[in-house]
Amino acid sequence: MKLTASANHTLDALLELVCVELQLTETQDGKSRGHYGAVADWLSREGSPLRGFDPHIFPQGSQRLGTTTKPIGKSEFDLDAVCKLTASQDWHPGELYQLLWDRLYANGLYRPMMKRMPRCIRLEYAGDFHLDIAPAIPDPACGGNCILVPDLNADLALEHPANNVWKSTNPQDYADYISSFFY
């Protein structure tokens, strides 16, 4: 069925309204970038136990792709970040996770916002969004931008280390690949 120009224009306008409602506003995007920067500063500043591992914080997933949308039935956006450290694979996943947890917990602002998740630590910001931060190390088996993230039951990570493993992933190259189709 072929649409008239008027009907096509109406559908385009409707889709644009839906997209605007689902994505971060410019203000929210600016706030999220500010939070990424503040977390990165806290993790890498002088006195941080992570500083010696050269922490690099970067967005991943929809935030990296610029396609962030509010999940259906949720009032907040789900933003994802990686905290890549130069630590070796000799680290146990639970130890690395705990190191990141302890550093975030040392900040009185972040402490009440923190929640343990299987592969990340969630900071629940009031209202607009939460930020999931996954600790990571380089994946020597894959090279390039590949990283290893903990795949663990966060509550049992240190008590039952045999149940926790590293999971290989490559969010940077994945985002670049997807972006190559659109930009």
Sequence positions of predicted segments:
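Conserved catalytic core of two-metal-ion nucleotidyltransferases
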Residues: L43-P49, Y97-D155, E159-A162, W166-T169, ...
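Glycine- and aspartate-rich repeat motifs characteristic of hemolysin/RTX-like Ca2+-binding segments
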Residues: D80
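Short beta-strand-to-loop capping motifs
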Residues: C83-A87
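N-terminal regions immediately upstream of nucleotidyltransferase
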Residues: M1-E76, S88-E95, C120-L123
